[in-house]
């Protein structure tokens, strides 16, 4: 067994002796054995002397020599676990409960809500010395709580497990309030974030009803068939369908610096390369080439009166739409472009360039059918349904 005469000797041996102590699972200080409780990252006195009288004299002698058994155990715990290596181990745990049990030294924490409630007991010294880790733990626990709410479960049913987890992390970071909120009243923040999730569900379901409803609609008549006059977008009077499509995409975009050469090149390539347009990875690849250097990687849920969902929720719905709904409910080749246009813009699954991407896919589908019919604004609005 690894042995030290006193706590000071242990402290002097750190951090070199740390791994050996962890592998051993125990150590001796002043002739007394202490074992590791892995669940709480702490040491406890092992095999105390039997008999009440003997334990009394042991404790009394220990107290006079170097403090109580409990204080020695705390000092060992601090030396071995209150460092970067101990923090790294805590951050690698699989849940906020495991993390919280280790950081707060409390095996009675059984749920993420228990972890959040434990923040109320923190003193200012602990908050200051472990600020970054406490912030991560608070966000982690709030995220796990959110996923178990009815709002979280409803959102998961729409966009899937991975997407709802990603969105929960972002929402908690934006609205959770961190350590201060966890200390004060985490339930208030949880309720507020549930309202954000509920708005997201409402927007996604509204988009889903509209977009999937197009599958039972004749898109070759009425407003859906309205075309844009040639002179409204084709100022140069080009006659090649690829060039006409490029002119239409550029004319409709509000973004500055559209690369006409790049758009034309992509149209030529995808018109003949046969890549599956009902594959999300293929769409992401095309989007990255069409809209390079996107400045942001996330658009949050709309809570200020608009109807757009978050980019994460929108992407999740778009993936399910093209890889699930449209494959299970196939549409005519001549209508595929309109359905892709509606899905990309209606769900708004990219952080930027949704309009360009929707028009690009519409144009590619048209070109694969050896035609190009430019959509009028009324047709576009009726297809994507965004108010």
From Swiss-Prot:
Domain notes: The fido domain mediates the adenylyltransferase activity.
InterPro entries (UniProt xref): Fido, Fido-like_dom_sf, VopS_N
Binding residues for ATP: 76-77, 122-124, 353-355, 359
Mutation effect (residue 348 to A): Abolishes adenylyltransferase activity and its ability to induce cell rounding in host cells
GO molecular function, one term: ATP binding
NCBIfam families listed in its UniProt record: PRK14052.1 (NF010653)
Gene name per UniProt: vopS
Origin organism lineage: Bacteria, Pseudomonadati, Pseudomonadota, Gammaproteobacteria, Vibrionales
Keyword hit for Nucleus: no
Domain (Fido) ranges: 278-387
Alphabetized UniProt keyword annotations: ATP-binding, Nucleotide-binding, Nucleotidyltransferase, Secreted, Transferase, Virulence
Keyword Nucleotide-binding annotated: yes
Enzyme class: transferase
Mutant phenotype after disruption: Abolishes the ability to inhibit host Rho family GTPases and cause cytoskeletal disruption.
Subcellular location(s) per record: Secreted
Gene Ontology biological process terms in this record: symbiont-mediated perturbation of host small GTPase-mediated signal transduction
Effect in UniProt of substituting residue 356 to A: Abolishes adenylyltransferase activity
Descriptive protein name: Protein adenylyltransferase VopS
Impact reported for residue 299 to A: Abolishes adenylyltransferase activity
Cellular component annotations (GO), alphabetically ordered: extracellular region
Primary residence: secreted
Enzyme Commission code(s) on record: 2.7.7.108
Taxonomy, superkingdom: Bacteria
């Amino acid at each position: 067994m690894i042995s030290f005469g006193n706590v000071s000797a242990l402290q002097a041996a750190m951090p070199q002796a740390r791994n050996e102590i962890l592998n051993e699972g125990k150590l001796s200080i002043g002739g007394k054995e202490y074992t590791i409780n892995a669940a709480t990252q702490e040491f406890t006195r092992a095999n105390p002397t039997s008999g009440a009288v003997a334990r009394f004299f042991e404790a009394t002698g220990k107290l006079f020599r170097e403090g109580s058994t409990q204080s020695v155990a705390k000092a060992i715990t601090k030396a071995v676990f209150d460092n970067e290596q101990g923090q790294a181990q805590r951050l690698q745990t699989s849940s906020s409960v495991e993390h919280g049990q280790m950081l707060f030294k409390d095996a009675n924490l059984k749920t993420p809500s228990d972890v959040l409630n434990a923040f109320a007991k923190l003193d200012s010294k602990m908050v200051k010395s472990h600020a970054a880790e406490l912030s991560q733990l608070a966000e982690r626990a709030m995220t796990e709580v959110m996923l178990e709410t009815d709002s979280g479960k409803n959102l998961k049913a729409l966009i899937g497990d991975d997407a709802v987890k990603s969105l929960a992390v972002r929402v908690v970071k934006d609205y959770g309030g961190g350590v201060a909120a966890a200390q004060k009243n985490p339930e208030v923040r949880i309720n507020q974030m549930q309202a954000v999730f509920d708005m997201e569900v409402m927007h996604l379901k509204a988009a889903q009803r509209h977009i999937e409803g197009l599958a039972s609609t004749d898109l070759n008549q009425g407003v859906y068939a309205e075309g844009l006059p040639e002179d409204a977008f084709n100022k140069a009077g080009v006659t090649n369908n690829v060039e006409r499509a490029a002119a239409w995409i550029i004319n409709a975009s509000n973004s500055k610096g559209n690369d006409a050469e790049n758009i034309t090149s992509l149209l030529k390539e995808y018109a003949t390369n046969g890549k599956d347009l009902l594959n999300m990875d293929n769409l992401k690849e095309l989007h990255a080439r069409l809209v390079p250097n996107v400045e942001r990687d996330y658009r949050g849920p709309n809570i200020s009166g608009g109807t757009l969902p978050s980019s994460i929720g929108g992407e999740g719905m778009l993936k399910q739409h093209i890889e699930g709904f449209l494959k299970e409910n196939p549409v005519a080749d001549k209508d595929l472009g309109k359905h892709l246009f509606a899905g990309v813009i209606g769900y708004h699954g990219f952080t930027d360039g949704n309009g360009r991407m929707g028009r690009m896919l519409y144009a590619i589908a048209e070109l694969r059918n050896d035609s190009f019919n430019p959509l009028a604004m009324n047709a576009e609005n009726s297809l994507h349904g965004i108010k």
